[in-house]
Amino acid sequence: MGYLRNIGAIAKGMGITFSEMFKPTTVENYPDGPGVLRGAVFQERFRGMHVLQRDENGLEKCVACFLCAAACPSNCIYIEAAENTETNRVSGAERYAKVYNIDYNRCIFCGYCVEACPTDAITHGHGFELATFNASNLVYRKEQLLSGKPAHIGANEIFASDSREQQRLDQKAAK
């Protein structure tokens, strides 16, 4: 009698499995699905990759106060400060961040750096495509953070050196 109950339970489970096998999938094909460059919609509070801001005069807002680095629980922000001169004015304050790196190998996107910044120099953008084959590509420099554009956009850019992949990307762009 116990065997019949077990067989019935197995048949019920297999019935559910087989019914799910023939339903249409709801998975988007990455990287061809929604993304930053393909019109994805993000909530205002989305915490994506960081962006360093400039003021209305085009100067950097970062004054190298190190509060963002101090607030970071994962210690992924590295800053080196330098003094502004009259001939070389980078920010509106006495100092500026000569080096500003964020290591996305360590970043947990908590937002503490954004909250700690007194000048609103660092904000969260909408970038989320961080996939790469080399961990050193995930250390973003000041120039990459100021532009607001990631150094690489998804996996397609990584394979661009392969001539066949480059031809496929060119054909796709021409459509």
Curated annotation (Swiss-Prot):
Q: Where does [4Fe-4S] cluster 2 bind?
A: C72, C107, C110, C113
One cellular component GO annotation, for this chain's record? plasma membrane
- GO BP terms in the entry: aerobic respiration
In this chain, [4Fe-4S] cluster 1 is annotated as bound at C62, C65, C68, C117
Is Cell membrane one of the keywords? yes
How does the record classify its membrane topology?
Answer: Peripheral membrane protein
UniProt keyword Heme present = no
- Molecular function (GO) terms listed? 4 iron, 4 sulfur cluster binding; iron ion binding; NADH:ubiquinone reductase (non-electrogenic) activity; quinone binding
Q: Which UniProt keywords apply?
A: 4Fe-4S, Cell inner membrane, Cell membrane, Iron, Iron-sulfur, Membrane, Metal-binding, NAD, Quinone, Repeat, Translocase, Ubiquinone
Highest taxon of the lineage: Bacteria
Q: Which cofactor does it need?
A: [4Fe-4S] cluster
**Classification via InterPro entries:** 4Fe4S_Fe-S-bd, 4Fe4S_Fe_S_CS, NADH_quinone_OxRdtase_chainI
Q: Can you state which reaction this protein catalyses?
A: a quinone + NADH + 5 H(+)(in) = a quinol + NAD(+) + 4 H(+)(out)
- A Pfam family it matches: Fer4_7
Entry note: cofactor: Binds 2 [4Fe-4S] clusters per subunit.
Q: Which residues form the 4Fe-4S ferredoxin-type domain?
A: 50-82, 98-127
Protein's job: NDH-1 shuttles electrons from NADH, via FMN and iron-sulfur (Fe-S) centers, to quinones in the respiratory chain. The immediate electron acceptor for the enzyme in this species is believed to be ubiquinone. Couples the redox reaction to proton translocation (for every two electrons transferred, four hydrogen ions are translocated across the cytoplasmic membrane), and thus conserves the redox energy in a proton gradient.
UniProt xrefs under NCBIfam families? NuoI, PRK05888.1-3
The protein, known as: NADH-quinone oxidoreductase subunit I 2
Which organism is the protein's source?
Koribacter versatilis (strain Ellin345)
Q: Which classification does the entry list for the species?
A: Bacteria, Pseudomonadati, Acidobacteriota, Terriglobia, Terriglobales
- Its gene is nuoI2
